[in-house]
Amino acid sequence: MHCPFCFAVDTKVIDSRLVGGGSSVRRRRQCLVCNERFTTFEVAELVMPRVVKSNDVREPFNEEKLRSGMLRALEKRPVSSDDVEMAINHIKSQLRATGEREVPSKMIGNLVMEQLKKLDKVAYIRFASVYRSFEDIKEFGEEIARLED
């Protein structure tokens, strides 16, 4: 890594430590030319697959869109933000684990419903009613009956 002070090419690592619960590495480095010390952080760059919408439009995966959809369903429900973040991370892990460059938006919707079902049944019904375009109260009842099985 180049020295940020003298721009020399050669630096050495003096110390490395895991930070952020093991998700990144903090390194102390020293320039071999000017002897200045500096800190770097190393994080794995994980590429998410692109999303193929139902109309065949392709767009980059948008974590914020995923989060806002889940939070809308979970509004005023007793679910912690930590639990929501864990669910989002689980969905992202499942998407990466497919190994595909593109995934259908329907797959993401199904993964969201799976996580919401575990977090909060009311939020699950809210999300499912919009996602599956429930037309009447009968469809709500059928979905609730499936939950009780």
Curated annotation (Swiss-Prot):
Keyword NAD: no
Methyltransferase in keyword set: no
GO terms of biological process kind: negative regulation of DNA-templated transcription
InterPro entries for this protein: ATP-cone_dom, NrdR-like_N, RNR_NrdR-like
Signal peptide: none
Keywords carried by this UniProt record: ATP-binding, DNA-binding, Metal-binding, Nucleotide-binding, Repressor, Transcription, Transcription regulation, Zinc, Zinc-finger
Organism listed in the record: Shigella boydii serotype 18 (strain CDC 3083-94 / BS512)
Family label: Belongs to the NrdR family.
Positions annotated as zinc finger (unnamed): 3-34
Cofactor binding note: Binds 1 zinc ion.
Gene Ontology terms for molecular function: ATP binding; DNA binding; zinc ion binding
Pfam families attached to this UniProt entry: ATP-cone, Zn_ribbon_NrdR
Protein name (database record): Transcriptional repressor NrdR
HAMAP family to which the protein is assigned, alphabetical: NrdR
Necessary cofactors: Zn(2+)
PANTHER family for the chain: TRANSCRIPTIONAL REPRESSOR NRDR (PTHR30455:SF2)
Domain ATP-cone: 49-139
Task of the protein: Negatively regulates transcription of bacterial ribonucleotide reductase nrd genes and operons by binding to NrdR-boxes.
